[in-house]
């Protein structure tokens, strides 16, 4: 890990064993948000990756409820794009589409407004962390229901032992930091 910006972000990630339930090692991104320099570095690193991987092909960044909302708008702003929200069920007005998913420590449902995108628009999904892949997989399913093209999913942290990347199938995935 030679990149100084990446080192800065990595130093800000904290670990909490047995949270929120026994057996889970929680990776806390709060210190990244608290430190404007490390937050800016995380956005720069993700934006640089997306510029190299996709150039100007991205139409929207989709932020996942709730910590994806912390990174999605800033990343979209950095790239000169709009940000759409994929929320937990019951949080969006108007007609929506819904998908169920399993989490590392529970179950849930996500939804998106039916008019959030036009068919064929290209989207990158962002969240703070990839664990089992359930949330990102559900987000990709929702975007597919709207006939959008998911170019890639990205996160700050990936928990590799939970193999969430595999759940995404053919959708490319990128993370800044990987932990067992």
Curated annotation (Swiss-Prot):
Q: Where, per UniProt, does this protein localize?
A: Cytoplasm
Question: What is a single cellular component term in the Gene Ontology annotation?
Answer: cytoplasm
Q: Which reaction does it catalyse?
A: AMP + diphosphate = 5-phospho-alpha-D-ribose 1-diphosphate + adenine
Q: For this chain's UniProt record, which GO biological process terms are given? A: adenine salvage; AMP salvage; purine ribonucleoside salvage
Using the record's annotations, give every residue carrying the modification Phosphothreonine: 135
Q: Give yes or no: UniProt keyword Phosphoprotein.
A: yes
Q: Phosphoserine modification sites? A: 15, 30, 66
Classify the main location: cytoplasm
What keywords is this UniProt entry annotated with?
Acetylation, Cytoplasm, Glycosyltransferase, Phosphoprotein, Purine salvage, Transferase
Q: Could you tell me which pathway this protein works in?
A: Purine metabolism; AMP biosynthesis via salvage pathway; AMP from adenine: step 1/1
Q: Positions modified as Phosphotyrosine?
A: 60
Q: Which InterPro entries match?
A: Ade_phspho_trans, PRibTrfase_dom, PRTase-like, UPRTase/APRTase
- Keyword NAD present in the record's keywords: the answer is no
Domain of life where this protein originates? Eukaryota
SUPFAM superfamilies linked to this entry: PRTase-like
Please give the residue positions where the record annotates the modification N-acetylalanine.
2
- Which Gene Ontology terms cover its molecular function? adenine binding; adenine phosphoribosyltransferase activity; AMP binding
Per the UniProt entry, the Enzyme Commission number(s) are 2.4.2.7
Q: What does the protein in this record do?
A: Catalyzes a salvage reaction resulting in the formation of AMP, that is energically less costly than de novo synthesis.
- What family does the Swiss-Prot or TrEMBL record give for this protein? Belongs to the purine/pyrimidine phosphoribosyltransferase family.
Q: How does it assemble?
A: Homodimer.
Q: What is this protein called?
A: Adenine phosphoribosyltransferase
Organism whose genome encodes this protein: Bos taurus
